[in-house]
Amino acid sequence: MNYTPFMSVFDVDPPIIDNKHLIKWLKINFSFLRNKLLKIKQLDSERDINFIIFINNKKKYVLKISNPLEKINILKYQDRLINYLRSDLSLKSFIPKIHHTNIVKYLDKKNRECFVRILSYIEGRMYGDTKSNDKIENSLGKLLGKVSTKLKAFNDIDAHRNFIWDPSNIKWIKKDINIFTGSKKLILLKCFSEYEKFVKNNLNKLRYSITHSDPNNYNIVIKENNVCGLLDYGDSIYSPTINDLAICLSYALMNNDNIYLTLKNIITEYNKQFSINEDEINSLISLCKSRLMITVVMAKKQRIKYPSNQYLSISEKDAWSLLEKLDKIPINFLIYIVREICGFDIIHHHNEIINYINKFNFGNIFKFNLLDKNKSILKLSSDSPLLKGNPDNSSLKKRVNKIFKEDNSRIGIGLYNEKRKVYKGPNFISELNTNERRNIHLGIDIFIDQGTDLFAPIDGKIIILKNNNFKYDYGPTLVLEHSFKKYKFYTLYGHLSKIMFQKLKIGKKIKKGEWIGKIGNSNENGKWLPHLHFQIILDLLGHDKNFPGVGEEFLFNIWNKISPDPNLILRIPKSFYSNNNNFKDTLKKRRKNISDNLSISYKKPLHMLEAKDQYFFDRYGRRYLDCVNNISHVGHSNSYVHEAMTKQNLKLNTNTRYLYDTINDYSELLLSKFPKKLNKIFFVCTGSEANDLAYRIAQTYTSAKDVFVMDNAYHGHTNALIDLSPYKFNSKGGLGKKDYVHVLDMPDPLRGKWRYQNSNWIQKYID
């Protein structure tokens, strides 16, 4: 529907009434009011005029006198709508009852025809005059959801009309934005642009029905912390069903310190009654802002026309305050909040991007691989002893260097999802709950020497290159855009050196491994100890100069989807972050409880925390190539092996004494890899058992005893195998070589008795 300007009820004065004359007229025209003591009190209204009727100073009714231009068919439609809603027992008590039999004409003081209706009065306080709470907001969402559900099955030809307050049809408002100037005009232009993107282009995808169209805070009645009434059906039209929720929110969020909680309360309960789909979610916030636009535009125009009617501007100040607050919150972030509330994936393509990142072979961001260096965890949380004051405190460097010395490292890691107390400025106060701050770290900090070169871990394009030169901000900042298929994600590099501005420019394409900057010093990086703030971003939320490095704790589930853990790219083992073990305590317990015969390798023992594929990872997050353990045949933490073992153990785990298929299947598969002569299998549990059994078979088959072994060999821990192992019998505590054991030199061309410089070195070993 397109709105076309025409002479409407908004263009003429509302009825002008003589109260005494009206009371006499009421007694004549309504039988239930005859012979009664009547008093009337005018209510606030916009285009018509309404009164409370008091009968004998007790019983109350609502008297509605229409605008002279109001058409009777619209009023009859309203009555049909009210009766339809009251036919639902769960809604009946919330909807005013009609007390007029017919709609009667009344002439105002200007002799203009107006129509009169009488409805029941619902006792309570207006939502706009009530301090809201969870219970009120929940009941409001529930009632609106029920109304939307009920109205799905109702239609009326008179509801199909253009209406100036319809937030889904505000093309008319564009020209009126010019009556504003400065920041207000910019806010309205931005809102209109969002309307075109999120509403106008989405209208064909929205569900339509008859809507109340004005569930504002003075059409909602509250009693005992519950909504008890929904008033005024004069704005009801056929429009996108989601309009009612959007309009309700545009008023419920006014003068509200906790926008998030109100959104959550109302939308959650509405969604339980009337399930919101993804297209409606995409339009909801913009529809809410569009209604606020209508409010401020109409208020200014009406105030000029009727300067004495303060009711016409009743919501203007609050609407502007909310528009200014919402303007600071990216609309996509608000959409993500609604998606989470309604149970949808926060970012619909999140999993595709994360799967791509998990599989991609990223390059190093420094000249070296972080996994090949000792690293120290630098906790900057609220209870951390590191931060005794401001982050630029000179003693911080001393405390960090002390940790580096203890860990024999020169690299510090500041944690993702860490709650920090250093973000104290007013710009860190949450717009969604002013009682909370943005204090959860959304990146990983890598503390390293200033001047250290940085390199792109993946191909990209520079889209942000900005010096955010504010205290405790990023300082020189770089953001790269990365594309695959139809998706994009971004990496942010903060606290860099200004030198990058001389060598890089916006739009420059960067190849994996290409230089992208240096670590900045504290005079240029926002007054921080030299480090890199590294962050992954799936949606820039409209930012083109900067991006938040910290988010609200109560919104972390959303921030986590927008800025997932940067360790997806860095790939420092998880055990490094969760390592709470004290090396000295671990070593002490080992020596106390485990025999010294089970020796520990290396003078300074390696404290291993994790293993994956061919690598071990120690407590410093440093990796080691495992060439010792037999597990390297299939790799550590092999998910396929783990899954197969788990599946089998949940079904059956027994020995060779019983008949079952698994052992046969495995035997056939294993034998298929061997020569045909090897056609029988012995199953044992360890290498010692296998070697001992093979030795006994050989003895039995040959009736011989003599054995050739290599020097320094170890074959197992059974008595028979220790006698065959020079590593054991020739070592301290060993019993020496048996006469049937013959030790051969290990043919080592580099360190052996005969070396490759001797052309006959191989023959020497044979001889």
Regions found by a protein language model. Give the residues of each.
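PLP-dependent aspartate aminotransferase-fold enzymes
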Residues: 668-766
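ATP/Mg2+ or Mg2+-diphosphate-binding catalytic cores
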Residues: 10, 295-348
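Zn2+-dependent peptidoglycan hydrolase active-site motif and core
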Residues: 456-500
